[in-house]
């Protein structure tokens, strides 16, 4: 699934230049690049602000402006490395390609807290994932989920439309990398229960549930 900036509709109407500026990040971050940036922070212990700014510099973006006035908008993030990096990039791009002053509010503990902060206006935008948007924010029904889940673009379009309709928030264009959920299982258990895919796991759990019902 895609990662993209999620912005309050009210904020975007007031400052449409935000959308124009952040469109510059469209497709700029591949899976490999995102993994490398996370590595620099988690393993090399480099500050997310430094890693984000140096990455944007390498791409040729302007990064020298660092405003210190009263904030026009507030960028938020959840409380893990990838979010810190993306939020720092949003700040750099907005401050260097608009005349807006930006504050940063990081470490929001989870999707519901971050999204509620967005709705209340405590923050104006934050990085979010379309898979999370589909399942946690929109809470899509099972039939619709099964119809669109195999297509990243269909998920993006559905989440974008429903988010605007229900909450007046806008999904901007994707950063580029694919963010999906995965499951880890001990090798001996995969062999023991003949599980090599999520479908196998679902079948195993369904059978287990049926046995418990007997």
Protein language model regions, located:
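Short, well-ordered beta-strand elements
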Residues: 68-83, 100-107, 210-214
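Periplasmic-binding protein-like
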Residues: 14-52, 166
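Soluble non-cytosolic domains of exported or imported proteins
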Residues: 12-16, 42-46, 50, 80-88, ...
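Immediate post-signal peptide segment of exported/extracytoplasmic ligand-binding proteins
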Residues: 53-75, 199-213
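Generic secondary-structure signature for well-ordered alpha-helical cores
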Residues: 23-31, 57, 61, 95, ...
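Extracytoplasmic/secreted envelope proteins and their assembly/folding machinery
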Residues: 19, 26, 49-56, 84-91, ...
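A conserved helix-loop-strand patch within extracytoplasmic ligand-binding domains
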Residues: 8-12, 27-31, 152-214
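Short, glycine-/small- and polar/acidic-enriched structural segments
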Residues: 85-188
């Amino acid at each position: 699934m895609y990662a993209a900036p999620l912005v309050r509709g009210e904020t975007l109407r007031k400052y449409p230049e935000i959308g124009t500026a952040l469109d510059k990040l469209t497709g700029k971050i591949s899976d490999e690049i995102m993994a490398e940036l996370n590595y620099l922070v988690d393993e090399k212990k480099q500050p997310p602000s430094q890693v984000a700014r140096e990455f944007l510099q390498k791409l040729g973006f302007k990064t020298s402006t660092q405003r210190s006035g009263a904030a026009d908008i507030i960028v938020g993030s959840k409380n893990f490395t990838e979010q810190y990096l993306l939020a720092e990039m949003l700040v750099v791009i907005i401050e260097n390609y608009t005349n807006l002053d930006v504050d940063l509010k990081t470490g929001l503990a989870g999707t519901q807290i971050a999204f509620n902060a967005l709705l209340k206006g405590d923050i104006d935008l934050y990085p979010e994932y379309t898979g999370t948007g589909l399942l946690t924010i929109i809470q899509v029904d099972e039939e619709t989920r099964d119809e669109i889940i195999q297509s990243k673009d269909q998920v993006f379009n559905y989440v974008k439309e429903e988010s605007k309709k229900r909450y007046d928030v806008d999904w901007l264009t994707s950063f580029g990398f694919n963010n999906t959920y995965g499951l880890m299982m001990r090798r001996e258990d995969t062999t023991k229960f003949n599980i090599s895919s999520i479908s196998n796991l679902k079948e195993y759990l369904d059978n287990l549930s049926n046995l418990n019902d007997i």
